[in-house]
Amino acid sequence: MDVHYDADPALIHDKQVAVIGYGSQGHAHALNLHDSGVDVAVGLRPGSSSRPKAEQQGLTVMDIGEAAAWGDVVMLLIPDQHQKDVYEAKIAEHMTPGTALGFGHGFNIHYDRIEPPEAVDVFMVAPKSPGHLVRRTYTDGSGVPCLAAVDQDPSGGAMALAISYADAIGGTHAGVIETTFKDETETDLFGEQAVLCGGSQALIQAGFETLVDAGYPEELAYFECLHELKLIVDLYYEGGLEYMNHSVSDTAEYGGYTRGPRVIDDAVREQMQEILEEVQSGEFADEWIEEYEQGAPQLQEERAALTEHPIEQVGQTLRGMMPWLNGDETSADEDAPDAADTAPASSS
């Protein structure tokens, strides 16, 4: 894969950039672009709670349609499930030859929910971190790795523009990796479902329930199966699998090697393959959009059930004993009817 550490800053500086949305990724992109000297405006719906925040931070704020008409580059950074409706109602009519449409995640392009005119460049810049870290590393003089992809390139310069955009938000300090909309979308969704959100949550709950059902205190089960997971994930994050195993006790390392494969066995791998196939075929995308269009009843049901799970009850009590957990820096995308953040941020 090609990795870029340099860009032509003039490409994005010669454009007017409309960032649609001011949530986790939107605020970071807009502020970083602004501080890099790019002519940027934020497009928000009327009544958005993000309007005063963006204005207080020195940004120009417009209605979404106004911003789309003003921008040479329109960067769509609202949740996946809202993008199609917003694009068709407010943005599509302004996508004229010579303009460019950007995304922070490939969902709506890859699954053909948004189909821009052929004369419009379509690109993606996807930082591989939450928005608050995109912003913090930029202000520290560095950046986070970004993925860049192109779906349409009538100008012949869409990838160069994407890399220039990534440079303006700090991405070239860490590296901008060329990919495709297909690969970014499918790996992102699979990772969320099988490992990061779905798989890890199911594993945590199963471990907690196994200990509690065997008669162990809920508090100990919480510490061993949820709280201490951060210690291990931080080691993965810092140095990979080998570094984690080098950092734990020999007892823990041996137990992990010999028992871990019994948890993630061939049956689990078969389920992972099935999940991947559902992502690749578009089955999951269709299922999720249908769920959303029906008012998300299953999502609401799952949220309510999780709130009542014993691991949440005991966790709330134990976290109250940990005052250092109060400084949460994360922010969800707010410029939408709900606050879901599906622009990994993948999430994700």
Curated annotation (Swiss-Prot):
The active site is at residue 105. Its cofactor is Mg(2+). NADP(+) binds at residues 22-25, 45, 48, 50, 80-83, 131. Keywords: Amino-acid biosynthesis, Branched-chain amino acid biosynthesis, Magnesium, Metal-binding, NADP, Oxidoreductase. Mg(2+) 2 binds at residues 188, 224, 228. GO terms for molecular function: ketol-acid reductoisomerase activity; magnesium ion binding; NADP binding. Pfam families: KARI_C (PF01450), KARI_N (PF07991). It comes from the Bacteria. The keyword Amino-acid biosynthesis applies. Residues 323-348 are annotated as: Disordered. Residues 1-179 form the KARI N-terminal Rossmann domain. Involved in the biosynthesis of branched-chain amino acids (BCAA). Catalyzes an alkyl-migration followed by a ketol-acid reduction of (S)-2-acetolactate (S2AL) to yield (R)-2,3-dihydroxy-isovalerate. In the isomerase reaction, S2AL is rearranged via a Mg-dependent methyl migration to produce 3-hydroxy-3-methyl-2-ketobutyrate (HMKB). In the reductase reaction, this 2-ketoacid undergoes a metal-dependent reduction by NADPH to yield (R)-2,3-dihydroxy-isovalerate. HAMAP family: IlvC. This is Ketol-acid reductoisomerase (NADP(+)). The lineage of its organism: Bacteria, Pseudomonadati, Rhodothermota, Rhodothermia, Rhodothermales.
